[in-house]
Regions:
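Beta-strand-loop-alpha-helix segment that lines the small-molecule cofactor/substrate pocket
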Residues: 105, 112-176
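N-terminal Rossmann-like dinucleotide-binding module
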Residues: 16-80
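N-terminal secretory signal peptides and thylakoid transit peptides that target proteins
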Residues: 1-11
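Conserved acidic residues
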Residues: 61, 100-103
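Active-site-proximal beta-strand/loop segments in catalytic clefts of secreted hydrolases
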Residues: 26-30, 64-68, 108-110, 149-152, ...
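Short acidic-hydrophobic, aromatic-tinged amphipathic segments that line or gate anion-handling sites
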Residues: 84-92
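Structured segments of extracytoplasmic/periplasmic soluble domains
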Residues: 33, 42-49, 95, 108, ...
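Short amphipathic alpha-helix with an adjacent loop that forms part of the alpha/beta core around
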Residues: 92-99
Length: 176
């Protein structure tokens, strides 16, 4: 058994052994007070509103980060909660099995070092990440719900394509 396969066993065991939904978290970068912290950390630790605690309803089973921030917390949280930080979106969605192995995808593409266009819009790779998600869905012959933080893309054409893929492959898509 290769080291990588061995290190994926805790996430696979967690996913296989519970009736809870398994979520792949895809992030551009993950640090305190980032959008990834606001979303992914709540899926790990739950959250409080007023005096009521809301436990996480599902399990994060993999994390992909496009960039590692100098004050990264993604690696520490992955280690603490027992899921792998992977090097590709495909690995995050397949857990190393070669087929779709999660029940949902969180796409958090906000923050990080990305270029700006002539309108001073930061070109976060939401479309590019989403395209890789879709490739896994197509290869697997099935799809799962996707949540995309913020709007879909800075480009109308790219946003429309993302919407069209969700209709074509019949998966729920939420953004906001």
């Amino acid at each position: 058994m290769r080291r990588r396969s061995f290190l994926q066993l805790p996430a696979a065991a967690l996913a296989a052994g519970s009736g809870r939904k398994r979520i792949a978290a895809l992030s551009t970068t993950y640090h305190v007070r980032s959008h990834s912290d606001n979303f992914i950390t709540r899926f790990l630790e739950g959250y409080w509103i007023d005096d009521r605690y809301y436990p996480p309803p599902c399990d994060i089973v993999s994390l992909y980060m496009d960039q590692v921030h100098p004050a990264d917390i993604g690696n520490r949280l992955a280690s603490a909660y027992g899921f792998p930080v992977v090097k590709s979106i495909e690995q995050a969605l397949t857990l190393g099995t070669g087929k779709l192995a999660v029940d949902g995808v969180l796409q958090i593409a906000e923050h990080g070092n990305y270029p700006f266009n002539d309108r001073q819009q930061q070109l976060y790779p939401r479309y590019e990440i989403f395209e890789q998600i879709v490739k896994v869905f197509q290869k697997s012959g099935r799809s799962v719900p996707v949540f995309s933080d913020k709007h879909l893309s800075w480009s109308w054409t790219k946003a429309k394509q993302m919407y069209d893929w969700s209709n074509e492959l019949k998966f729920p898509l939420m953004a906001g």
